[in-house]
UniProtKB/Swiss-Prot annotation:
Record's note on what induces expression: Coexpressed with pceA.
Described purpose of this protein according to its UniProt entry: May act as a membrane anchor for the tetrachloroethene reductive dehalogenase PceA.
GO cellular component: plasma membrane
Coiled coil: none
Protein name: Probable tetrachloroethene reductive dehalogenase membrane anchor protein
Source organism of the structure: Desulfitobacterium hafniense
Source species taxonomy: Bacteria, Bacillati, Bacillota, Clostridia, Eubacteriales
Gene this protein is translated from: pceB
UniProt entry keywords in alphabetical sequence: Cell membrane, Membrane, Transmembrane, Transmembrane helix
Residues annotated as transmembrane: 3-23, 35-55, 66-86
Location(s), subcellular: Cell membrane
Membrane topology: Multi-pass membrane protein
Superkingdom of the organism of origin: Bacteria
C-alpha cells in the first residue's frame, strides 16, 4: 500500500463525514431531525461510501467485474434509505380539518 492508497481512503472517510454533516443540516433545516431519519440517512451514506470503497479496492486489484457488482449491489442498496429519507423529510404535515359548529345535511 503506497501513500496514494492511504490518501484515497482518507478522502473517502472525509467524504463520509461531509455527507453525514450535509444530511444533518438538511434535516435540521427542514425541522425533521429525528433519530429514525438520521439513522436512515446514515445507512444511505454508509452504503454509498461503501460502494465507492468497494469500487476503488476492486479497481486496484484489477477485478473489473467486481466494480460493477459493487456499484449495483451497494449503490442500489444506498438508494433505498436515501429515497425513504428524502420522502419523509419532504412529506407535508397533515392538515387538521376544522370542525364546524353546525351539522350539514
Amino acid at each position: 500500500m503506497n501513500i496514494y492508497d492511504v490518501l484515497i481512503w482518507m478522502a473517502l472517510g472525509m467524504t463520509a463525514l461531509l455527507i453525514q454533516y450535509g444530511i444533518w443540516r438538511y434535516l435540521k433545516g427542514k425541522g425533521k431531525d429525528t433519530i429514525p431519519l438520521q439513522i436512515c440517512g446514515f445507512l444511505a451514506n454508509f452504503f454509498f461510501i461503501f460502494a465507492l470503497a468497494w469500487g476503488y479496492s476492486s479497481f486496484s486489484e484489477r477485478e473489473y467485474q467486481a466494480i460493477g457488482m459493487g456499484f449495483i449491489f451497494f449503490g442500489g442498496t444506498a438508494l433505498i434509505p436515501a429515497i425513504i429519507t428524502y420522502r419523509l423529510a419532504n412529506h407535508p404535515a397533515k392538515k387538521i380539518r376544522e370542525s364546524s359548529d353546525s351539522i350539514s345535511a
